[in-house]
Amino acid sequence: MYLLDTNVISELRKGGDGQAAAVAWFSKVDAGEMFISALTLIELEIGILRVQQRDSDHGARQCIWFETQVCPEFEDRTLSVDAAIARRCAQLHVPDPKSDRDTLIAATALEHGLNIVT
């Protein structure tokens, strides 16, 4: 089973060369085996809000994509951060501190026995 990093979800929306590879991979994996972290929802929404400040039309399209595709698709497959994940995250920061969000996503994958897809 897999934990999809935020960039994988974003790539599907963007299109381009990376999208073809992502779509090909997605078509081979059962949807029930793909999960996201609640942090991915945070990162996507922050990105959309930033786009909306610069270009309201583009931001509105991204918001529709997020609300009608991402949220419903992963409604039952979004993993929250709990105490075990928080503690694993702390362990990943020592001796070399890293980004909190990335480390929480990695800790989520480790605690759930999932492979991270980036």
Predicted ranges, named:
Residues I46-V51, A60, I64, P72-V117:
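Active-site neighborhoods of divalent-metal-dependent phosphate/nucleic-acid chemistry enzymes
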